[in-house]
From Swiss-Prot:
Subunit structure, interactors included: Component of the Mediator complex.
Record bears the keyword Lipoprotein: no
Protein name: Mediator of RNA polymerase II transcription subunit 10
Organism of derivation: Aspergillus clavatus (strain ATCC 1007 / CBS 513.65 / DSM 816 / NCTC 3887 / NRRL 1 / QM 1276 / 107)
InterPro entries noted in UniProt: Mediator_Med10
Role played: Component of the Mediator complex, a coactivator involved in the regulated transcription of nearly all RNA polymerase II-dependent genes. Mediator functions as a bridge to convey information from gene-specific regulatory proteins to the basal RNA polymerase II transcription machinery. Mediator is recruited to promoters by direct interactions with regulatory proteins and serves as a scaffold for the assembly of a functional preinitiation complex with RNA polymerase II and the general transcription factors.
Length: 167
């Protein structure tokens, strides 16, 4: 059996949503016994669509890996990330995002908060890096003036760490 792809599950979800919309419309326009059979049919269709979705999203054991070519001139299979419609079993979501959705929150908010957190961390690291670079340069300048006999070692350390050389 071929692996279920993301587009298959996407189509199944769209079908479930369509059936829910049809049921909502049928309930809104409910006229009594004459529309009851139509409503029952729509509910049965929804049940079938949910069953299909459940079947497609059940975890299956991963397929065995394809045999590796022995000829080095044979081109390797394209990477999974290059596939626009990957198998469902290859998609892994961080548990934090799943918890966010379970708590009825928008996963885009999680993404935005994560990006802001990373930016803050990057700014902190940049500040520390600049502070240490400034400290390195000041220390080198002071060591050159206090211990002229170590000038060569100081220059070597500055070259190795990307510091400013004194002319």
């Amino acid at each position: 059996m071929a692996p279920v792809t993301l587009s298959t599950v996407d189509d199944d979800l769209k079908e479930v949503i369509q059936h829910l919309f049809e049921i909502q419309s049928a309930v809104h326009g409910y006229l009594g016994p004459e529309t009851q059979q139509e409503l029952v049919r729509k509910i049965k269709n929804l049940t079938l669509a949910l069953s299909t979705l459940s079947t497609h999203t059940k975890p299956h054991p991963p397929p065995p890996p394809p045999p590796q070519p022995t000829d080095p001139t044979t081109a390797a299979a394209p990477a999974l990330r290059d596939n626009p419609d990957p198998p469902l079993s290859s998609i892994q979501l961080p548990p934090e995002i799943i918890d966010y959705v379970d708590a009825a929150r928008n996963p885009d908010i999680y993404t935005r908060e994560f990006v802001e957190l990373v930016q803050r961390g990057n700014q902190d690291l940049k500040g520390k890096k600049e502070a240490f670079a400034s400290f390195r340069d000041v220390l080198a300048r002071e060591m050159r003036s206090a211990m002229p006999e170590c000038r060569g070692e100081v220059e070597r350390v500055l070259e190795g760490t990307g510091g400013k050389r004194e002319r």
